Swiss-Prot record:
InterPro entries: Kinase-pyrophosphorylase, PPDK_reg. It comes from Acidiphilium cryptum (strain JF-5). This is Putative pyruvate, phosphate dikinase regulatory protein. It comes from the Bacteria. Its EC number is 2.7.11.32, 2.7.4.27. It holds the Pfam family Kinase-PPPase. One of its GO terms (molecular function) is phosphotransferase activity, phosphate group as acceptor. Belongs to the pyruvate, phosphate/water dikinase regulatory protein family. PDRP subfamily. NCBIfam families: PRK05339.1 (NF003742). Bifunctional serine/threonine kinase and phosphorylase involved in the regulation of the pyruvate, phosphate dikinase (PPDK) by catalyzing its phosphorylation/dephosphorylation.
Length: 292
C-alpha cells in the first residue's frame, strides 16, 4: 500500500530520540531534488518513551506518509516498525547503513546512546571560540588578530565573505574576512600570511543586483554598503564594477591566492570549496617542510 497523498503532497514523518536535526537535514537535502512536489515534514523529536511514541503514532495515522527514523532504542524501533507495517507505510532507519558499515570496518559493535553527538565536548567549545573570532574579525576588523586565523577570506563588497565566514565558524574554523577596495592597500599581514588566503568572487551582473538591493534596504541614505558610500555611482555602475572585479582578480593572481566564484553557489558549497583549498594549502606546506 502506497502512502496517502493529495495530488503531489506527501507527508514525511521524521522520528528521532534526539533533536532530529540529522533527519531534518537528510529529508531537506532529498526533498529539494523533487521539484514541484509538496513534501510536508512532520518532526517528532526527543522520542524516548512508549507514551511519547504513541503520540507520534497517532500523528502518523492522522496524516499518513512514510517514516524516516533514527531511534536507537530497540523496543521503540520494533513498535514503530510494527505500527508502520500495520498502517501499510514504509519506514527507513536512516543511520543503520552507516552504523553497519562502521561496525564492519572497525570490527566493533555500536553502543547506542541517544543524543551523544550533542554532548558538550572540545569540538563544541572550538566552534564557540571560532564564532567569537568571526564576530570580532568581520569586514577587516581587529587586523592584529589575523595571525590567529585559520583562513582569511578576501573579496569585493557583497561577495559572501561574511556568511561564508560564519558557516566555517560553525565547523570550528576561525575565518577572518578582509574587503578588497580599489585604491586602499590591503593589510600588511597579507604580504606574508600565516594561513591560507582565499579570494571570493561573483559575476558582475548578480553582484550589481545584490548591491542595488542593498542600497534599497539602506534607503539610499544612511549607513555604509561595505567599503563604498551608498550614494556612490561606482558601487552599482556596470563598468566600474567590472573594473573593480578585474583589479581584485589580478591582485589575487599576483599574490598567488586561489579564488572561488560564488555565483550560483550556496554558502555551503562555497565553504566546501574553501575547505578544499585550505587542505591543499596545508598539504603544500607539509611537503615543503618534509623536503627541506
Amino acid at each position: 500500500m502506497r502512502p496517502c497523498m493529495d495530488g503531489k503532497r506527501l507527508n514525511l514523518h521524521l522520528v528521532s530520540d534526539a533533536t532530529g536535526d540529522t533527519l531534518n537535514a537528510v529529508a531537506r537535502a532529498a526533498s529539494v531534488q523533487f521539484e514541484g512536489s509538496d513534501i510536508h515534514l512532520h518532526r517528532w523529536s526527543l522520542i524516548r518513551s512508549r507514551l511519547q511514541l504513541h503520540r507520534v503514532l497517532e500523528g502518523i495515522e492522522a496524516e499518513r506518509g512514510p517514516v524516516l527514523c533514527s531511534l536507537l532504542d530497540q523496543a521503540l524501533r520494533h513498535e514503530l516498525d510494527e505500527a508502520c507495517q500495520r498502517l501499510g507505510l514504509r519506514i527507513l532507519h536512516v543511520l543503520d547503513p552507516v552504523f553497519d558499515l562502521l561496525a564492519e570496518e572497525l570490527g566493533t559493535p555500536t553502543r547506542p546512546t541517544p543524543g551523544r553527538q550533542y554532548v558538550l565536548d572540545a569540538d563544541y567549545f572550538r566552534r564557540i571560540d571560532a564564532m567569537h573570532f568571526v564576530l570580532s574579525h568581520d569586514d577587516g576588523q581587529a587586523l592584529r588578530g589575523l595571525a590567529e586565523a585559520d583562513v582569511i577570506l578576501v573579496g569585493v563588497s557583497r561577495s559572501s565573505k561574511t556568511p561564508t565566514s560564519f558557516y566555517l565558524a560553525n565547523r570550528g574554523i576561525k575565518a577572518a574576512n578582509v574587503p578588497m577596495v580599489p585604491g586602499i592597500e590591503l593589510p600588511g599581514v597579507l604580504d606574508d600570511p600565516p594561513c591560507p588566503v582565499v579570494g571570493l568572487f561573483i559575476d558582475a551582473e548578480p553582484l550589481i543586483e545584490i548591491r542595488r538591493h542593498r542600497l534599497t534596504l539602506l534607503g539610499q541614505g544612511g549607513g555604509a554598503a561595505g567599503a563604498f558610500r551608498p550614494d556612490s555611482g561606482d558601487y552599482v555602475d556596470e563598468e566600474a564594477v567590472k573594473a573593480e572585479l578585474l583589479w581584485a582578480r589580478r591582485t589575487c593572481s599576483a599574490r598567488g591566492w586561489p579564488t572561488v566564484n560564488v555565483t550560483r553557489r550556496s554558502i555551503e558549497e562555497t565553504a566546501a570549496a574553501v575547505l578544499k583549498l585550505m587542505d591543499a594549502w596545508h598539504e603544500r606546506r607539509r611537503r615543503t617542510a618534509t623536503s627541506a
